[in-house]
Amino acid sequence: TSVRNEVIGVITTVLAMAYILAVNPGMLGGTGMGFGPVFTATAISAAIACLCMAFMANLPVALASGMGLNAFFTYTVVGGMGCSWQFALTAVLIEGILFILLSLFGVREAIINSIPATMKKAVAVGIGLFICLIGLTNAGITVGKDLGTVIGFVNFDVSSALVAIIGLFITIALYVLNVPGAVLLGIIITTLIGIPFGVTTIPQDFKVFSLPEAPHFFAFEWSNVFTLKFFIVFFTFLFTDLFDTIGTLMGVTQQANLVDKEGNIPNVKGALMADAVGTVAGACLGTSTVTSYVESSAGVAAGARTGLASVVTAGLFIVALFFTDLFAIIPSAATAPALIFVGYLMMKPVMQIDFEDPTEGIPAFITIMTMPFAYSISKGIALGVIAFVFCKIFGRKLKDIPVVTWVLGVIFVAYFIFEAVK
């Protein structure tokens, strides 16, 4: 690698995930927290977590407040259950502290290393399809239909979809021509193309530079910690964050060829610790669970390979504090082509899956299929592990099931039962 490649990769990653700086404050702001304080908390907690990733694991994986987890925070915990946002932040804090302990004692590392090699490859492919679907959805290329057609292709009279498709083919052309930073250039060019289409909008009160607002420091609520409601919220945050992070780390490191022959991640303990520290920092500052981002794959595709990428990413998140409006004008139609294209790049491990052996191929297929269609990395891993144990039992290959995988299978079955009855 080189400093130039790392920087190009970082900028690509940050642009691909810059939406979180607008989406997360907008979402959590609806709970009464306010856009400005949450924006500041989102950027600072992401910077802290990225620095931890750089110095603890030397990996090019970016972290920030997780999509999905922030929706659960806002619409389920606060909106649906009627809890305060301080209550939700307390659950995030305790989850993060527990993750630090689990990381210190190697529990999370043992879980990752226990996942069979075939399943690790399937996770990478499934994540590729998942982020491809995110890109297609964000751009409005695929849209929900009636029950007869669950998902459909948009008409080309939708400007954002048209701009995104143009941007996708521009990105493909740049990549095929071996142009350095093809994904990043694709984002920039698509943003510019979006101006005459009205997709890229520059507000009248646009300011290049602005001072950040103070976040909500240590805004916790301890009075309802020992309740069933708190346990349900805490457990949901815990499970989703744990396996989303595991899946993302496996997917990104495999794409970057940073794994060993067994598919294990180097310095995984440090990577998991960075994720946990980021979550604690985020809760203390006033934002939802911090987790590893699948959009890091876009940066890897553009050249990021080491912790230097994470250091620069952290720096850019701090810089973003003072350029809120500049990041906000990059439309989802411009980042969508990057996510769709990275989905292609993450398909490669599928060729290494042994589909001739149904005890390997079926669990891999279920993992790959579940992630995009259930819109969940964690549920893809859970169903895949259950299917792996099931197939090995009926295939009379019990010796192929590691002890920890047995335990995970039981935990995942219990989790789905818990989800059904809660």
Can you annotate each of these PLM segments?
Residues 1-24, 45, 66-75, 79-127, ...:
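Helix-loop-helix junctions within the multi-pass membrane cores of secondary transporters/permeases
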Residues 1-37, 152-154, 184-269, 412-414:
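Helix-loop-helix hairpins and the membrane-proximal interhelical loops
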Residues 32-51:
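Loop-to-helix transition at the N-terminal end of transmembrane alpha-helices
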Residues 47-67, 97-98:
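Juxtamembrane transmembrane-helix boundary signature
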Residues 81-196, 200, 311-422:
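Membrane-embedded alpha-helical modules
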